[in-house]
Regions:
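ATP-dependent adenylate-handling active sites, centered on carboxylate activation for C-N bond formation
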Residues: 3-6, 10-115, 119-126, 141-192, ...
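A ubiquitous short alpha-helical element
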Residues: 130, 149-153, 225-229
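Core structural elements
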Residues: 130-138
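PAPS-dependent sulfotransferase catalytic core
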Residues: 192-254
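ATP/NTP-dependent adenylation/nucleotidyl-transfer catalytic domains that generate, transfer
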Residues: 160-161, 217-222, 260
Length: 282
């Protein structure tokens, strides 16, 4: 599916309408477009949400350095995100403390048996963190983007019987042959071609074309030039100006939201505030 530039802009804001909230920018809109194409041919589809959570597909399960990092592994930019808020809001919202409290609460809910090694305990915590937080975000995204197109998407890996069973499977089995979701790959061997079965995991697509960054940067420059947009009521203008020249390696959220997606997300926030008549009071 190929889209013209102006259509990409429209898709990004249509994704906000589908969520009723700002989301994951073009990561959302690409799924929205994908679902609209599928709907031309069928009304029901299957999707793999929850497989990464229960079979250990994410990089933060597999990379020891990321795994050992304190906090939600897909949200390591809380301090950076807080730096965008204007001073008045920042004084009222202690985002760093709030996120840390939710993180600690979730760790305490992890069901860990006595006698487990430090690594085994951490991997069990990671499963719980992903099931309770990251998976919920992806399920909501899939539901919103698909149903906006009247497409029913079913998620078989979310079946309670599978999820409960896999929760207790030791990591060395999930990590079969050192592959992401190795146990799942082995289970369906013979059902899929080997080039599909054993290919390296790839995250859901975002926009990689360099023109996309040019496009969203130009939109942000226009927003800053107008000076009266709702986004500027809550975000520091100078931080938005700095963002246009940044190239951060740590995502704003998840695995894919780097600088172009961060700019696009903030444009979504501005659109959402205008379209939904959002007013901020502190």
């Amino acid at each position: 599916v190929r889209r013209q530039r102006q259509m990409c802009i429209r898709d990004r804001y249509t994704a906000v309408d589908a969520r009723d909230l700002p989301g994951m920018a073009d990561v959302d809109s690409s799924l929205l477009l994908f679902c609209s194409e599928i709907r031309k041919y069928c009304t029901v589809a299957l999707s793999g949400e929850c497989a990464d959570e229960i079979f250990g597909g994410y990089p933060w399960y597999r990379d020891p350095k990321i795994r050992a990092t304190y906090g939600f592994p897909w949200a390591q930019s809380t301090k950076y995100r807080m730096s965008f808020l204007n001073e008045e809001l920042a004084e009222q919202i202690n985002g760093i403390t709030y996120v840390d409290q939710r993180y600690q609460e979730t760790l305490k809910q992890s069901d860990i048996l006595c006698g487990r090694t430090k690594e085994e305990r951490r991997l069990r915590e990671m499963v719980n963190l992903n099931m309770k937080w990251f998976m919920q975000t992806l399920l909501d995204r899939k539901d919103r983007m698909s149903m906006y197109n009247s497409l029913e998407v079913r998620v078989p890996f979310c079946d309670m019987r599978i999820a409960e069973y896999m929760y207790s499977v030791p990591w060395e089995y999930k990590d079969y042959q050192g592959y992401e979701k190795g146990l799942l790959r082995e289970a369906v061997k013979g059902l899929l071609p080997d080039e599909v079965l054993w290919r390296k995991k790839s995250p859901y697509p975002k926009t990689w074309h360099p023109k996309y960054r040019e496009l969203v940067s130009k939109q942000m420059e226009e927003l800053l030039a107008q000076g009266n947009e709702p986004l500027l009521q809550i975000v520091k203008k100078e931080k938005l100006q700095e963002l246009l020249h940044e190239d951060r390696s740590i995502p704003w959220y998840g695995q894919l939201m780097n600088t172009p997606q961060t700019i696009a997300y903030l444009l979504q926030v501005n659109y959402w505030m205008k379209a939904y008549h959002v007013q901020i009071q502190v």
